[in-house]
Amino acid sequence: RLGGGALRNQQDGLIFSQAGALEVQAGSLDNRQGTLQAQGDNRLRIGGALDNQGGRLDSRAGNLDLQSGSLDNGAGGVLNSAKGWLTLVTGLFDNSAGVTQAQSLEIRAGQGVRNQQGHLSALGGDNRIVTADFDNQGGGLYASGLLSLDGQRFLNQGAAAGQGGKVGAGRIDFSLAGALANRFGQLESESELHLRAAAIDNSG
């Protein structure tokens, strides 16, 4: 268990719990190009910013439980729970050009999600997201089971064919207070597809 104010684990730094759980409590965490890994549960409580650009937060056999003021997982950052679930409660979640994956996902990001060129996937179950605007331009959003999104706008468009975002799931249920922009984007469900939005642009 680690605690403190500002925690830095940059540039190939490694914090690893080989036999069990890892718990971190800090005012902020800078994990750029660093790794925080646990064999069991990996639990982080960060009061302010969690910067994981190019870094890795891992649970090998447990769950990944994250709370932070904001989370930047861009520039090749990885959030991974190989065999368990991942829960995230944060303000702005930036997953641009990052990878977030687990058997199931539950994300609450009060200030929005940025997933441009990113990959956000529930490999074995549901992917449930509650947020403000979700920007998936050029990104991938997936679930083996249900993909549920409650939010404001969903931006999935591209400038030309093949450049929009990709959404795929066993079932899709979107409830949006704002617009769904899907020009040159792709939304594909294996079974049910429910879209509720103030406006839908599906041209292209």
Residue ranges and their predicted role:
Residues R1-A6, Q18-G27, A38-G48, S59-S70, ...:
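Surface-exposed loop/turn motifs in large extracellular/passenger domains
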Residues Q10-F16, N31-Q37, N52-D58, N73-N80, ...:
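Short, T/G/N/S-enriched strand-turn elements that build extracellular solenoid repeat scaffolds
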